Amino acid sequence: MAPADIGLIGLAVMGKNLVLNMIDHGFAVSVYNRSPEKTEEFLKEHGENISLQGFTAIEEFVQSLKRPRKIMIMIKAGAPVDEMISSLLPFLEEGDILIDGGNSYYLDSERRYIDLKKKGILFVGMGVSGGEEGARKGPSIMPGGNIEAWPVIAPIFQSIAAQVDGQPCCSWIGTGGAGHFVKAVHNGIEYGDIQLICETYEILKSRLDLSLEQIGNIFFEWNQTDLNSYLMGASAAVLTAKDENGVAVASTILDVAGQKGTGRWVAEDAIKAGVPMSLIIESVLARYLSAWKEVRRQAAREFPVASLLYQPSQEASVLIEDAREALYAAKIISYAQGFMLLKQISEERNWDLNLGELALIWRGGCIIQSAFLDKIHQGFESCPDAHSLMLQDYFKNVLLNSETGFRRAILHAVGAGVAIPCLASALAFYDGYRTENSPLFLVQGLRDYFGAHGYERQDRPRGEFYHTDWLGSKNASRM
């Protein structure tokens, strides 16, 4: 059989569907899995395809590939990736390409890029988003690492990626771990999107006593507006789905949300970088809190909702519109925070990320795909140096016009004792971001009082620090 165009290791859901996607686009693929039975099972299902070869010996797998060899690894992140790379190296030659398509931490990808470059192997850390359906029909693909690999692998991955307006949702991101970092931020934004939708659902449920189906239908309507997105449509579908007995499927799901860790990575990276990514952080914490099901059940008995809570008088239609405005405004703020982190890390690592291009890559094939991303692209095109999306004309006007409804929706939630960590965090960030003179002068004054850390003065140039003799003369001296 003729040599294959690409090899793929790891026949879990994503790997299998990527293989089938590649074959559909005319590429011959060799596959390998550490568990031979998975390879054999996959071949039984699809072995009639002349573009597919399966191997149970890694050396034979490597030798089946065209040179330079292109091998995509789709296995669990962490040590398993390093172990797989080590097992491949004895059979590789200079110029061969290794592609890690899993959810690896970007600093691991940086390390692998550097180590493999010394050995003459071209490493690519590739973010792949879209889940099972995206992998099969066209994902959003975020490749980064060794730029020398891109001309060789671009024809494959730009062919299998989602297409929007005739453009592939796949373009080169940057060196080192740039691809995996962008994918992680994508996942963090996804966490925020999902949590905001959940909180909006709870406001409508608690204040208007609407059913799952009624709220699902509202979400279907909102999906025809500026809130149009994969997640809004999926949320509507989940809320309205009924089983064969007519029971709402969502009513049977335990309110304990899992996570794979990428959201936590982004939260930690934001804190290390000094970027106030409050929504993504709150969305991660909300999932941790959800895991305390038994504790929450007990606390619900111990702390019943007070009967004299604030209840603003309002027509249902007005509250529904306020909730929609709050969701859209918070979504803008969440994405603004995500792009702030992308910009900050890009500058620190000299990646020169094209933020407008990233918005285009995410328009199709991925979990956060939405019409909203076109607005982000246009914003960066017209105002590339703006500190935040919030300062770009379109988003600025939306925030100004929706502020009243946003605040009313928050009041409804607080008045009903509804936990809205992300919506509340979004409003707090908005208010803090536009506060010229904040009370944090007191923080720095206290730091100087008990720790002699010094402070900058309003009437002096930035960068000059002073210390006050708080317990003595109260006079300040330059440090």
Curated annotation (Swiss-Prot):
InterPro entries: 6-PGluconate_DH-like_C_sf (IPR008927), 6PGD_dom2 (IPR013328), 6PGDH_C (IPR006114), 6PGDH_Gnd/GntZ (IPR006113), 6PGDH_NADP-bd (IPR006115), 6PGdom_BS (IPR006184), NAD(P)-bd_dom_sf (IPR036291), Pgluconate_DH (IPR006183). Catalyzes the oxidative decarboxylation of 6-phosphogluconate to ribulose 5-phosphate and CO(2), with concomitant reduction of NADP to NADPH. This is 6-phosphogluconate dehydrogenase, decarboxylating. Keywords: Gluconate utilization, NADP, Oxidoreductase, Pentose shunt. The active site is at residues 183, 190. It is an enzyme of class 1 (oxidoreductase). It holds the Pfam family NAD_binding_2. One of its GO terms (molecular function) is phosphogluconate dehydrogenase (decarboxylating) activity. Belongs to the 6-phosphogluconate dehydrogenase family. The lineage of its organism: Bacteria, Pseudomonadati, Chlamydiota, Chlamydiia, Chlamydiales. Substrate binds at residues 103, 129-131, 186-187, 191, 260, 287, 447, 453. NADP(+) binds at residues 10-15, 33-35, 75-77, 103. Homodimer. GO terms for biological process: D-gluconate metabolic process; organic acid catabolic process; pentose-phosphate shunt.
